[in-house]
Curated annotation (Swiss-Prot):
InterPro entries: Beta-barrel_GLAA-B_II, Beta_helix, PbH1, Pectin_lyas_fold, Pectin_lyase_fold/virulence
Protein name as catalogued: Alpha-1,3-galactosidase A
Catalytic reaction annotation: Hydrolysis of terminal, non-reducing branched (1->3)-alpha-D-galactosidic residues, producing free D-galactose; Hydrolysis of terminal, non-reducing alpha-D-galactose residues in alpha-D-galactosides, including galactose oligosaccharides, galactomannans and galactolipids
Superkingdom of origin organism: Bacteria
Lipidation (N-palmitoyl cysteine): 22
Classification via SMART domains: PbH1
Designated gene of the protein: glaA
Protein backbone atom coordinates (compact mmCIF):
# COMPACT_ATOMS: atom_id res chain seq x y z
CA UNK A 1 0.00 0.00 0.00
CA UNK A 2 1.11 3.56 -0.60
CA UNK A 3 0.61 7.02 0.85
CA UNK A 4 2.01 10.50 0.03
CA UNK A 5 2.16 14.13 1.28
CA UNK A 6 3.06 17.69 0.28
CA UNK A 7 5.71 19.53 2.35
CA UNK A 8 9.29 20.66 1.81
CA UNK A 9 10.60 20.05 5.28
CA UNK A 10 13.63 22.19 5.98
CA UNK A 11 14.06 21.18 9.60
CA UNK A 12 13.61 17.47 8.87
CA UNK A 13 16.32 17.69 6.21
CA UNK A 14 18.65 19.34 8.70
CA UNK A 15 17.97 16.59 11.23
CA UNK A 16 18.73 13.74 8.84
CA UNK A 17 22.47 13.47 9.30
CA UNK A 18 22.37 13.36 13.09
CA UNK A 19 19.35 11.08 13.22
CA UNK A 20 20.69 8.21 11.16
CA UNK A 21 23.65 7.84 13.45
CA UNK A 22 21.36 7.40 16.44
CA UNK A 23 19.48 4.44 14.99
CA UNK A 24 21.14 1.05 15.09
CA UNK A 25 21.86 -0.83 11.88
CA UNK A 26 19.56 -3.62 13.04
CA UNK A 27 16.54 -1.31 12.85
CA UNK A 28 17.19 -0.67 9.17
CA UNK A 29 16.88 -4.36 8.40
CA UNK A 30 13.86 -4.97 10.64
CA UNK A 31 11.84 -2.26 8.82
CA UNK A 32 10.05 -1.45 12.09
CA UNK A 33 11.12 1.46 14.24
CA UNK A 34 9.55 2.89 17.37
CA UNK A 35 9.27 6.56 18.15
CA UNK A 36 10.91 5.62 21.46
CA UNK A 37 14.12 4.85 19.51
CA UNK A 38 14.30 8.58 18.83
CA UNK A 39 13.95 9.63 22.46
CA UNK A 40 10.18 10.10 22.88
CA UNK A 41 8.11 8.26 25.47
CA UNK A 42 4.29 8.06 25.56
CA UNK A 43 2.48 10.10 28.22
CA UNK A 44 5.59 12.18 28.87
CA UNK A 45 3.98 15.51 27.99
CA UNK A 46 7.08 16.37 25.98
CA UNK A 47 6.80 18.02 22.58
CA UNK A 48 6.83 15.12 20.10
CA UNK A 49 8.02 17.26 17.18
CA UNK A 50 11.83 17.02 17.62
CA UNK A 51 11.80 13.22 17.94
CA UNK A 52 9.29 12.91 15.11
CA UNK A 53 11.48 14.97 12.78
CA UNK A 54 14.36 12.56 13.40
CA UNK A 55 12.12 9.52 12.94
CA UNK A 56 10.67 10.77 9.65
CA UNK A 57 14.12 11.59 8.31
CA UNK A 58 15.12 7.99 9.01
CA UNK A 59 11.95 6.60 7.40
CA UNK A 60 12.49 8.67 4.28
CA UNK A 61 15.94 7.13 3.89
CA UNK A 62 14.49 3.63 4.35
CA UNK A 63 11.33 3.13 2.21
CA UNK A 64 9.08 0.38 3.50
CA UNK A 65 9.53 1.28 7.17
CA UNK A 66 6.78 1.10 9.78
CA UNK A 67 6.99 3.83 12.42
CA UNK A 68 5.35 2.65 15.64
CA UNK A 69 3.95 4.80 18.45
CA UNK A 70 3.49 2.65 21.58
CA UNK A 71 0.05 3.13 23.13
CA UNK A 72 -0.33 6.40 24.99
CA UNK A 73 -0.78 10.13 24.60
CA UNK A 74 1.55 12.21 22.45
CA UNK A 75 1.55 16.02 22.37
CA UNK A 76 2.55 18.11 19.36
CA UNK A 77 3.25 21.86 19.51
CA UNK A 78 3.34 24.11 16.47
CA UNK A 79 6.39 26.11 17.55
CA UNK A 80 9.07 23.66 16.31
CA UNK A 81 7.08 22.03 13.51
CA UNK A 82 8.22 22.18 9.88
CA UNK A 83 6.62 25.03 7.95
CA UNK A 84 5.87 25.63 4.31
CA UNK A 85 3.35 27.42 2.11
CA UNK A 86 0.46 25.18 1.09
CA UNK A 87 -2.45 25.45 -1.32
CA UNK A 88 -5.16 23.19 0.08
CA UNK A 89 -8.33 23.13 -2.00
CA UNK A 90 -11.54 24.35 -0.35
CA UNK A 91 -9.46 25.47 2.62
CA UNK A 92 -7.36 28.56 3.23
CA UNK A 93 -3.85 28.64 1.81
CA UNK A 94 -0.81 29.99 3.64
CA UNK A 95 2.27 29.06 5.63
CA UNK A 96 1.38 26.13 7.86
CA UNK A 97 3.25 24.28 10.59
CA UNK A 98 2.86 20.52 10.03
CA UNK A 99 3.52 17.72 12.51
CA UNK A 100 3.85 14.91 9.94
CA UNK A 101 5.14 16.50 6.68
CA UNK A 102 5.23 13.42 4.45
CA UNK A 103 6.67 14.73 1.19
CA UNK A 104 8.23 12.31 -1.31
CA UNK A 105 7.93 9.28 0.95
CA UNK A 106 7.49 5.71 -0.31
CA UNK A 107 5.79 2.76 1.36
CA UNK A 108 5.58 4.21 4.86
CA UNK A 109 3.30 2.96 7.63
CA UNK A 110 2.61 5.11 10.67
CA UNK A 111 0.94 2.97 13.34
CA UNK A 112 -0.30 4.68 16.48
CA UNK A 113 -1.37 1.40 18.13
CA UNK A 114 -4.43 3.15 19.56
CA UNK A 115 -2.58 6.25 20.75
CA UNK A 116 -4.04 9.70 21.21
CA UNK A 117 -2.32 12.49 19.25
CA UNK A 118 -3.10 15.88 20.80
CA UNK A 119 -2.16 19.08 19.00
CA UNK A 120 -1.50 22.54 20.41
CA UNK A 121 -1.98 25.74 18.45
CA UNK A 122 -2.57 26.37 14.78
CA UNK A 123 -1.06 23.47 12.83
CA UNK A 124 -1.91 20.68 10.40
CA UNK A 125 -1.36 17.21 11.87
CA UNK A 126 -0.60 15.39 8.60
CA UNK A 127 0.14 16.46 5.03
CA UNK A 128 0.92 13.72 2.52
CA UNK A 129 2.36 15.13 -0.70
CA UNK A 130 3.99 13.61 -3.78
CA UNK A 131 4.26 10.27 -1.99
CA UNK A 132 3.15 6.71 -2.67
CA UNK A 133 2.14 3.77 -0.53
CA UNK A 134 1.40 5.69 2.68
CA UNK A 135 -0.67 4.02 5.42
CA UNK A 136 -1.79 5.95 8.51
CA UNK A 137 -3.58 3.91 11.15
CA UNK A 138 -4.60 3.31 14.73
CA UNK A 139 -4.59 6.75 16.36
CA UNK A 140 -6.84 9.69 17.17
CA UNK A 141 -6.44 13.39 16.43
CA UNK A 142 -7.60 16.12 18.80
CA UNK A 143 -6.79 19.58 20.14
CA UNK A 144 -6.72 20.54 23.81
CA UNK A 145 -8.19 23.95 22.93
CA UNK A 146 -10.61 23.88 19.98
CA UNK A 147 -10.86 26.48 17.22
CA UNK A 148 -14.53 27.31 17.85
CA UNK A 149 -16.71 27.97 20.89
CA UNK A 150 -19.95 26.51 22.27
CA UNK A 151 -22.41 27.56 24.93
CA UNK A 152 -25.83 26.78 26.38
CA UNK A 153 -28.57 29.37 25.82
CA UNK A 154 -29.68 30.82 29.16
CA UNK A 155 -32.01 33.59 27.99
CA UNK A 156 -33.52 35.02 24.81
CA UNK A 157 -34.84 38.58 24.53
CA UNK A 158 -36.36 39.16 21.11
CA UNK A 159 -37.47 42.70 21.92
CA UNK A 160 -33.95 43.85 22.75
CA UNK A 161 -32.44 41.39 20.26
CA UNK A 162 -29.99 39.48 22.43
CA UNK A 163 -29.15 35.98 23.59
CA UNK A 164 -27.42 35.11 26.86
CA UNK A 165 -25.00 32.23 26.54
CA UNK A 166 -23.17 30.22 29.20
CA UNK A 167 -19.88 29.08 27.66
CA UNK A 168 -19.09 25.40 28.14
CA UNK A 169 -16.00 24.26 29.99
CA UNK A 170 -12.98 23.68 27.77
CA UNK A 171 -13.50 26.64 25.46
CA UNK A 172 -11.34 29.74 25.47
CA UNK A 173 -12.31 33.31 24.55
CA UNK A 174 -12.07 36.93 25.59
CA UNK A 175 -14.23 40.03 25.12
CA UNK A 176 -12.66 43.35 24.18
CA UNK A 177 -14.46 46.56 23.24
CA UNK A 178 -17.76 44.77 22.79
CA UNK A 179 -16.27 42.12 20.52
CA UNK A 180 -15.99 38.37 21.00
CA UNK A 181 -12.51 36.98 20.29
CA UNK A 182 -11.67 33.31 19.85
CA UNK A 183 -8.54 32.47 21.87
CA UNK A 184 -6.45 29.36 21.37
CA UNK A 185 -2.92 28.23 22.06
CA UNK A 186 -0.90 30.83 20.22
CA UNK A 187 -3.70 32.34 18.17
CA UNK A 188 -6.63 34.76 18.34
CA UNK A 189 -9.44 35.38 15.88
CA UNK A 190 -11.86 38.33 16.28
CA UNK A 191 -14.36 37.27 13.60
CA UNK A 192 -17.45 35.13 14.20
CA UNK A 193 -18.58 33.64 10.90
CA UNK A 194 -21.74 31.89 12.05
CA UNK A 195 -23.97 31.47 15.09
CA UNK A 196 -25.77 28.15 14.72
CA UNK A 197 -28.26 26.51 17.07
CA UNK A 198 -28.05 22.80 17.89
CA UNK A 199 -30.61 20.75 19.78
CA UNK A 200 -28.79 19.82 22.98
CA UNK A 201 -30.73 16.60 23.58
CA UNK A 202 -30.61 15.31 20.01
CA UNK A 203 -27.07 16.59 19.39
CA UNK A 204 -28.25 17.76 15.96
CA UNK A 205 -28.87 21.10 14.29
CA UNK A 206 -32.08 22.45 15.78
CA UNK A 207 -35.29 22.06 13.80
CA UNK A 208 -35.33 24.67 11.00
CA UNK A 209 -32.49 26.63 12.63
CA UNK A 210 -30.93 28.87 10.02
CA UNK A 211 -27.34 29.90 9.57
CA UNK A 212 -26.76 33.24 11.25
CA UNK A 213 -23.79 34.54 9.29
CA UNK A 214 -22.02 37.49 10.89
CA UNK A 215 -18.75 38.41 9.16
CA UNK A 216 -19.10 42.16 8.45
CA UNK A 217 -21.42 42.95 11.37
CA UNK A 218 -20.30 41.22 14.55
CA UNK A 219 -22.65 40.82 17.52
CA UNK A 220 -22.11 43.28 20.35
CA UNK A 221 -20.79 41.08 23.14
CA UNK A 222 -20.85 41.72 26.88
CA UNK A 223 -19.72 39.36 29.65
CA UNK A 224 -22.59 39.88 32.06
CA UNK A 225 -20.99 37.56 34.63
CA UNK A 226 -18.02 35.17 34.51
CA UNK A 227 -18.55 32.66 31.73
CA UNK A 228 -21.88 34.13 30.57
CA UNK A 229 -22.01 36.29 27.45
CA UNK A 230 -24.75 38.52 26.06
CA UNK A 231 -24.68 38.50 22.25
CA UNK A 232 -26.74 41.34 20.81
CA UNK A 233 -27.49 41.32 17.08
CA UNK A 234 -29.77 39.95 14.39
CA UNK A 235 -31.09 36.39 14.58
CA UNK A 236 -32.95 34.97 11.54
CA UNK A 237 -34.17 32.17 13.80
CA UNK A 238 -34.16 32.56 17.56
CA UNK A 239 -32.51 29.79 19.60
CA UNK A 240 -34.38 28.10 22.41
CA UNK A 241 -33.32 28.25 26.04
CA UNK A 242 -31.38 25.10 26.87
CA UNK A 243 -30.15 24.52 23.35
CA UNK A 244 -26.53 24.81 22.28
CA UNK A 245 -25.29 27.80 20.30
CA UNK A 246 -22.16 27.30 18.22
CA UNK A 247 -19.82 30.22 17.61
CA UNK A 248 -17.87 29.37 14.46
CA UNK A 249 -14.80 31.29 13.34
CA UNK A 250 -14.26 32.24 9.72
CA UNK A 251 -10.95 30.60 8.79
CA UNK A 252 -10.29 27.15 7.28
CA UNK A 253 -6.62 26.94 8.19
CA UNK A 254 -6.05 23.66 9.99
CA UNK A 255 -7.42 20.47 8.39
CA UNK A 256 -6.49 17.23 10.12
CA UNK A 257 -5.23 15.43 6.99
CA UNK A 258 -4.30 16.88 3.61
CA UNK A 259 -3.45 14.48 0.76
CA UNK A 260 -1.96 16.00 -2.41
CA UNK A 261 -0.52 14.52 -5.61
CA UNK A 262 -0.26 11.02 -4.21
CA UNK A 263 -0.68 7.38 -5.17
CA UNK A 264 -2.38 4.81 -2.95
CA UNK A 265 -3.10 6.44 0.40
CA UNK A 266 -4.81 4.51 3.21
CA UNK A 267 -6.29 5.85 6.45
CA UNK A 268 -7.40 3.06 8.79
CA UNK A 269 -8.89 3.01 12.29
CA UNK A 270 -8.50 6.73 12.90
CA UNK A 271 -10.65 9.00 15.08
CA UNK A 272 -10.69 12.69 14.21
CA UNK A 273 -12.24 14.45 17.19
CA UNK A 274 -11.55 17.99 16.02
CA UNK A 275 -9.81 20.14 13.45
CA UNK A 276 -9.84 23.81 12.50
CA UNK A 277 -11.01 23.04 8.95
CA UNK A 278 -11.81 19.77 7.14
CA UNK A 279 -11.12 16.33 8.53
CA UNK A 280 -9.63 14.81 5.37
CA UNK A 281 -9.03 16.85 2.21
CA UNK A 282 -7.58 15.05 -0.83
CA UNK A 283 -6.70 16.63 -4.18
CA UNK A 284 -5.11 14.93 -7.17
CA UNK A 285 -4.88 11.68 -5.21
CA UNK A 286 -4.60 8.50 -7.29
CA UNK A 287 -6.28 5.90 -5.08
CA UNK A 288 -7.41 6.77 -1.55
CA UNK A 289 -9.25 4.71 1.04
CA UNK A 290 -10.74 5.61 4.41
CA UNK A 291 -11.51 2.47 6.44
CA UNK A 292 -13.12 2.97 9.84
CA UNK A 293 -12.24 6.66 9.94
CA UNK A 294 -14.54 8.18 12.54
CA UNK A 295 -15.03 11.93 12.68
CA UNK A 296 -16.88 12.82 15.86
CA UNK A 297 -16.45 14.73 19.13
CA UNK A 298 -14.54 12.77 21.74
CA UNK A 299 -16.80 10.98 24.19
CA UNK A 300 -16.99 12.91 27.44
CA UNK A 301 -15.55 16.09 25.93
CA UNK A 302 -18.84 17.98 26.14
CA UNK A 303 -18.29 19.23 22.59
CA UNK A 304 -20.92 19.22 19.86
CA UNK A 305 -18.58 20.06 16.96
CA UNK A 306 -15.94 17.79 15.47
CA UNK A 307 -14.47 19.42 12.36
CA UNK A 308 -15.31 23.06 11.73
CA UNK A 309 -16.24 22.40 8.07
CA UNK A 310 -16.59 19.23 5.92
CA UNK A 311 -15.64 15.88 7.37
CA UNK A 312 -14.07 14.71 4.09
CA UNK A 313 -13.53 16.19 0.63
CA UNK A 314 -12.06 14.70 -2.56
CA UNK A 315 -11.20 16.92 -5.54
CA UNK A 316 -9.94 15.76 -8.92
CA UNK A 317 -8.88 12.41 -7.54
CA UNK A 318 -8.62 9.34 -9.75
CA UNK A 319 -8.40 5.58 -9.41
CA UNK A 320 -10.59 4.58 -6.47
CA UNK A 321 -12.12 6.64 -3.68
CA UNK A 322 -13.40 4.37 -0.91
CA UNK A 323 -15.19 5.27 2.33
CA UNK A 324 -15.85 2.11 4.34
CA UNK A 325 -17.44 1.83 7.79
CA UNK A 326 -16.85 5.50 8.66
CA UNK A 327 -18.71 7.83 11.01
CA UNK A 328 -19.26 11.48 10.09
CA UNK A 329 -20.80 13.31 13.05
CA UNK A 330 -20.68 16.87 14.33
CA UNK A 331 -18.91 18.41 11.33
CA UNK A 332 -20.15 21.90 10.48
CA UNK A 333 -20.65 21.12 6.81
CA UNK A 334 -21.04 18.07 4.59
CA UNK A 335 -20.03 14.51 5.37
CA UNK A 336 -18.22 14.08 2.07
CA UNK A 337 -17.76 15.75 -1.31
CA UNK A 338 -16.40 13.93 -4.36
CA UNK A 339 -16.12 16.14 -7.43
CA UNK A 340 -13.87 17.82 -9.95
CA UNK A 341 -13.17 21.50 -10.44
CA UNK A 342 -14.32 23.67 -13.33
CA UNK A 343 -11.94 26.34 -14.57
CA UNK A 344 -13.34 29.43 -16.30
CA UNK A 345 -12.11 30.47 -19.74
CA UNK A 346 -10.65 33.94 -19.12
CA UNK A 347 -9.02 34.66 -22.50
CA UNK A 348 -8.77 32.99 -25.91
CA UNK A 349 -5.37 33.64 -27.51
CA UNK A 350 -5.49 31.61 -30.72
CA UNK A 351 -6.97 28.42 -32.16
CA UNK A 352 -5.08 26.21 -29.70
CA UNK A 353 -4.38 28.38 -26.64
CA UNK A 354 -6.42 29.86 -23.81
CA UNK A 355 -5.89 31.28 -20.35
CA UNK A 356 -8.15 29.85 -17.67
CA UNK A 357 -9.04 31.10 -14.20
CA UNK A 358 -9.57 29.25 -10.93
CA UNK A 359 -12.50 31.26 -9.65
CA UNK A 360 -12.98 30.60 -5.94
CA UNK A 361 -10.30 32.01 -3.64
CA UNK A 362 -10.10 28.70 -1.75
CA UNK A 363 -9.23 26.78 -4.91
CA UNK A 364 -6.21 28.80 -5.96
CA UNK A 365 -2.85 27.27 -6.69
CA UNK A 366 -4.15 23.78 -7.54
CA UNK A 367 -2.50 22.48 -10.71
CA UNK A 368 -5.56 20.66 -12.03
CA UNK A 369 -4.54 20.43 -15.72
CA UNK A 370 -1.41 18.56 -16.74
CA UNK A 371 0.07 17.70 -20.16
CA UNK A 372 -1.82 14.72 -21.54
CA UNK A 373 -5.02 15.43 -19.58
CA UNK A 374 -8.26 14.99 -21.50
CA UNK A 375 -10.45 18.08 -21.11
CA UNK A 376 -14.16 18.68 -21.68
CA UNK A 377 -15.48 22.17 -22.50
CA UNK A 378 -19.01 23.18 -21.42
CA UNK A 379 -21.17 26.21 -22.12
CA UNK A 380 -23.16 28.42 -19.76
CA UNK A 381 -25.81 25.73 -19.14
CA UNK A 382 -23.13 23.04 -18.79
CA UNK A 383 -23.69 21.31 -22.11
CA UNK A 384 -20.43 19.66 -23.21
CA UNK A 385 -19.62 20.82 -26.75
CA UNK A 386 -15.91 20.06 -27.19
CA UNK A 387 -13.10 17.86 -25.89
CA UNK A 388 -9.37 18.14 -26.32
CA UNK A 389 -6.02 17.09 -24.81
CA UNK A 390 -3.60 19.38 -22.96
CA UNK A 391 -0.27 19.87 -24.72
CA UNK A 392 1.44 22.20 -22.26
CA UNK A 393 0.62 24.58 -19.43
CA UNK A 394 2.24 27.77 -18.16
CA UNK A 395 1.32 28.97 -14.69
CA UNK A 396 0.90 32.75 -14.59
CA UNK A 397 0.15 32.89 -10.87
CA UNK A 398 -2.04 31.05 -8.36
CA UNK A 399 -5.20 32.03 -10.24
CA UNK A 400 -4.38 31.93 -13.97
CA UNK A 401 -2.79 29.33 -16.25
CA UNK A 402 -2.18 29.52 -20.00
CA UNK A 403 -2.85 26.19 -21.71
CA UNK A 404 -2.10 24.95 -25.22
CA UNK A 405 -4.09 22.04 -26.63
CA UNK A 406 -3.07 19.38 -29.12
CA UNK A 407 -6.04 19.96 -31.44
CA UNK A 408 -7.70 23.21 -32.60
CA UNK A 409 -10.34 24.50 -30.24
CA UNK A 410 -14.00 24.56 -31.22
CA UNK A 411 -14.94 27.89 -32.80
CA UNK A 412 -17.97 28.04 -30.47
CA UNK A 413 -15.67 28.44 -27.46
CA UNK A 414 -16.09 31.77 -25.67
CA UNK A 415 -14.98 33.54 -22.54
CA UNK A 416 -16.85 32.31 -19.41
CA UNK A 417 -17.24 28.77 -20.76
CA UNK A 418 -15.75 26.18 -18.41
CA UNK A 419 -13.34 23.28 -18.76
CA UNK A 420 -13.06 20.10 -16.74
CA UNK A 421 -10.24 17.55 -16.41
CA UNK A 422 -11.66 14.14 -17.36
CA UNK A 423 -8.39 12.29 -16.79
CA UNK A 424 -8.35 13.13 -13.10
CA UNK A 425 -11.73 11.56 -12.30
CA UNK A 426 -12.26 8.49 -10.10
CA UNK A 427 -12.92 5.23 -11.90
CA UNK A 428 -14.79 3.97 -8.86
CA UNK A 429 -16.33 5.64 -5.79
CA UNK A 430 -17.60 3.35 -3.03
CA UNK A 431 -19.35 4.62 0.10
CA UNK A 432 -20.36 1.64 2.21
CA UNK A 433 -21.38 1.06 5.81
CA UNK A 434 -21.00 4.71 6.80
CA UNK A 435 -23.05 6.85 9.16
CA UNK A 436 -23.84 10.52 8.44
CA UNK A 437 -25.48 12.35 11.34
CA UNK A 438 -25.46 15.32 13.69
CA UNK A 439 -23.84 17.77 11.29
CA UNK A 440 -24.67 20.99 9.50
CA UNK A 441 -25.64 20.82 5.78
CA UNK A 442 -25.62 17.68 3.63
CA UNK A 443 -24.46 14.08 3.73
CA UNK A 444 -22.70 13.18 0.46
CA UNK A 445 -22.19 15.46 -2.57
CA UNK A 446 -21.24 13.32 -5.55
CA UNK A 447 -20.49 14.65 -9.05
CA UNK A 448 -17.87 12.59 -10.86
CA UNK A 449 -18.10 10.56 -14.05
CA UNK A 450 -16.86 7.22 -12.70
CA UNK A 451 -18.94 4.41 -11.21
CA UNK A 452 -20.49 5.50 -7.89
CA UNK A 453 -21.97 3.04 -5.40
CA UNK A 454 -23.64 4.21 -2.17
CA UNK A 455 -24.78 1.22 -0.15
CA UNK A 456 -25.67 0.15 3.39
CA UNK A 457 -25.30 3.63 4.88
CA UNK A 458 -27.32 5.58 7.44
CA UNK A 459 -28.20 9.23 6.77
CA UNK A 460 -29.80 11.65 9.22
CA UNK A 461 -28.75 15.07 7.95
CA UNK A 462 -30.29 18.55 8.29
CA UNK A 463 -30.35 19.01 4.52
CA UNK A 464 -30.17 16.59 1.59
CA UNK A 465 -28.64 13.23 2.39
CA UNK A 466 -27.31 12.85 -1.15
CA UNK A 467 -26.79 15.81 -3.47
CA UNK A 468 -25.88 15.22 -7.11
CA UNK A 469 -25.47 18.69 -8.54
CA UNK A 470 -22.30 20.56 -9.60
CA UNK A 471 -21.78 23.59 -11.76
CA UNK A 472 -22.61 26.29 -9.24
CA UNK A 473 -21.27 29.77 -9.83
CA UNK A 474 -19.59 29.99 -6.42
CA UNK A 475 -17.43 26.89 -6.00
CA UNK A 476 -17.28 25.80 -9.67
CA UNK A 477 -17.52 22.14 -8.65
CA UNK A 478 -17.68 20.00 -11.77
CA UNK A 479 -19.62 16.94 -12.83
CA UNK A 480 -21.75 15.34 -14.19
CA UNK A 481 -22.45 11.77 -13.03
CA UNK A 482 -22.74 8.92 -15.52
CA UNK A 483 -23.36 5.84 -13.34
CA UNK A 484 -24.75 5.89 -9.79
CA UNK A 485 -26.31 3.16 -7.65
CA UNK A 486 -27.95 4.10 -4.34
CA UNK A 487 -29.07 0.92 -2.61
CA UNK A 488 -29.92 -0.55 0.79
CA UNK A 489 -29.52 2.72 2.69
CA UNK A 490 -31.60 4.23 5.50
CA UNK A 491 -32.60 7.90 5.16
CA UNK A 492 -33.85 8.89 8.61
CA UNK A 493 -35.85 12.14 8.75
CA UNK A 494 -33.41 14.27 6.81
CA UNK A 495 -34.04 17.90 5.86
CA UNK A 496 -34.99 19.01 9.35
CA UNK A 497 -33.26 22.35 8.77
CA UNK A 498 -34.33 23.00 5.18
CA UNK A 499 -37.24 22.07 2.92
CA UNK A 500 -35.52 19.76 0.47
CA UNK A 501 -35.49 16.13 -0.63
CA UNK A 502 -33.51 13.27 0.81
CA UNK A 503 -31.96 12.79 -2.64
CA UNK A 504 -31.53 15.85 -4.87
CA UNK A 505 -30.30 15.48 -8.46
CA UNK A 506 -30.29 18.99 -9.89
CA UNK A 507 -27.47 20.85 -11.71
CA UNK A 508 -26.13 23.79 -9.76
CA UNK A 509 -26.71 26.39 -12.46
CA UNK A 510 -30.35 27.32 -12.89
CA UNK A 511 -31.53 27.33 -16.49
CA UNK A 512 -34.44 26.30 -18.69
CA UNK A 513 -32.27 23.87 -20.62
CA UNK A 514 -33.84 20.50 -21.36
CA UNK A 515 -30.70 18.69 -22.45
CA UNK A 516 -29.59 15.96 -20.02
CA UNK A 517 -26.79 16.76 -17.61
CA UNK A 518 -26.70 13.73 -15.28
CA UNK A 519 -27.44 10.19 -16.41
CA UNK A 520 -27.93 6.62 -15.22
CA UNK A 521 -28.98 6.92 -11.57
CA UNK A 522 -30.51 3.86 -9.90
CA UNK A 523 -32.20 4.18 -6.50
CA UNK A 524 -33.47 0.90 -5.13
CA UNK A 525 -34.18 -1.10 -1.97
CA UNK A 526 -33.73 1.87 0.35
CA UNK A 527 -35.82 2.89 3.36
CA UNK A 528 -36.88 6.54 3.57
CA UNK A 529 -38.28 7.79 6.88
CA UNK A 530 -39.72 11.22 6.12
CA UNK A 531 -41.62 13.75 8.20
CA UNK A 532 -41.96 16.23 5.30
CA UNK A 533 -42.92 13.75 2.53
CA UNK A 534 -40.01 14.79 0.30
CA UNK A 535 -37.98 11.91 -1.07
CA UNK A 536 -36.50 12.63 -4.52
CA UNK A 537 -36.11 15.71 -6.72
CA UNK A 538 -34.49 15.36 -10.13
CA UNK A 539 -33.97 17.59 -13.14
CA UNK A 540 -32.11 17.17 -16.44
CA UNK A 541 -31.38 13.52 -15.76
CA UNK A 542 -31.43 10.84 -18.44
CA UNK A 543 -32.08 7.36 -17.16
CA UNK A 544 -33.27 7.38 -13.56
CA UNK A 545 -34.99 4.55 -11.74
CA UNK A 546 -36.73 4.56 -8.37
CA UNK A 547 -37.56 0.93 -7.65
CA UNK A 548 -38.51 -1.24 -4.65
CA UNK A 549 -38.05 1.45 -2.02
CA UNK A 550 -39.92 1.75 1.29
CA UNK A 551 -41.13 5.24 2.24
CA UNK A 552 -42.54 5.72 5.75
CA UNK A 553 -44.27 8.89 6.95
CA UNK A 554 -43.11 9.84 10.48
CA UNK A 555 -43.89 12.42 13.14
CA UNK A 556 -40.26 12.95 14.20
CA UNK A 557 -40.57 16.69 13.48
CA UNK A 558 -43.59 18.98 12.91
CA UNK A 559 -45.10 18.35 9.50
CA UNK A 560 -44.35 20.97 6.86
CA UNK A 561 -46.40 21.38 3.73
CA UNK A 562 -44.34 21.57 0.59
CA UNK A 563 -45.00 22.68 -2.97
CA UNK A 564 -43.10 19.60 -4.10
CA UNK A 565 -44.46 16.09 -4.45
CA UNK A 566 -42.61 13.23 -2.72
CA UNK A 567 -41.15 12.24 -6.10
CA UNK A 568 -40.54 15.36 -8.21
CA UNK A 569 -39.26 14.86 -11.77
CA UNK A 570 -38.57 17.63 -14.28
CA UNK A 571 -36.95 17.64 -17.73
CA UNK A 572 -35.78 14.07 -17.28
CA UNK A 573 -36.16 11.02 -19.51
CA UNK A 574 -36.25 7.24 -19.19
CA UNK A 575 -37.77 7.46 -15.73
CA UNK A 576 -38.66 4.08 -14.19
CA UNK A 577 -40.84 3.94 -11.07
CA UNK A 578 -42.12 0.63 -9.74
CA UNK A 579 -42.53 -1.56 -6.69
CA UNK A 580 -42.32 1.23 -4.12
CA UNK A 581 -44.21 1.03 -0.83
CA UNK A 582 -45.57 4.27 0.68
CA UNK A 583 -46.74 3.89 4.30
CA UNK A 584 -48.75 6.44 6.28
CA UNK A 585 -49.18 9.11 3.59
CA UNK A 586 -52.97 9.11 3.40
CA UNK A 587 -53.06 10.28 -0.22
CA UNK A 588 -52.08 8.93 -3.60
CA UNK A 589 -50.58 12.03 -5.23
CA UNK A 590 -47.00 10.90 -4.96
CA UNK A 591 -45.50 11.86 -8.31
CA UNK A 592 -44.92 15.14 -10.10
CA UNK A 593 -43.69 14.73 -13.66
CA UNK A 594 -43.09 17.83 -15.79
CA UNK A 595 -45.89 19.95 -14.39
CA UNK A 596 -48.45 17.25 -13.70
CA UNK A 597 -49.33 15.47 -10.47
CA UNK A 598 -49.74 11.75 -11.00
CA UNK A 599 -51.69 9.49 -8.70
CA UNK A 600 -50.28 6.03 -8.32
CA UNK A 601 -49.86 3.02 -6.10
CA UNK A 602 -46.11 2.91 -6.53
CA UNK A 603 -46.20 0.61 -9.54
CA UNK A 604 -46.11 3.19 -12.29
CA UNK A 605 -43.66 2.79 -15.14
CA UNK A 606 -43.03 5.43 -17.72
CA UNK A 607 -40.93 8.21 -19.14
CA UNK A 608 -40.92 11.81 -18.04
Amino acid sequence: MQRRTFIKSISAMMATSTTLGCVSNSLATEKHVSITDFGLRPNSGDDAIPALQKALAYCKKHPGTSLIFPLGRYDFWSTKADRDFYYISNNDDGIKPVAFPLTEFKNLIIDGQGSRFVFHGGMVPVIVRESSGITLKNFSVDWDVPFHCEGIVEAVNKKESYVDLKIKDGFSYKVENGRFIFVGEGFENPVIKNLLEFDTKRQKQAYMARDNFQREIQPVTTEIRPGVLRLQGKYPTWPKVGNTLLLMQERRDWPAFSVQDTKNTWLENIDIHHSGAMGVIAQLADGIKLDNVNIHPKDGSGRTVSTTVDATHFINCKGHVVLKDCLFQGQIDDGTNVHGMYARVAEIHDSNTITFELVHYQQLGIDIFKPGSKVNFSDSVLNVFHDNVVDKTVRQDAKYWTVSFKEPLDTALKVDDVLDNMTWQPDHVMISGCRFTGNRARGALLTVSGKIIVENNYFSTPMMAIKIGSGGLKWYESGPVESVEIRNNIFDNCNYAKDSSAIDIVPGRKSKATTPYHQNVKIYQNEFRVYNERVLTTSRTQGISFVSNKIVKTSEYPERKSAFAPIHVERSSNFVYQGNDFIGFGHSELLFIDGQLVSGSGKLEGEG
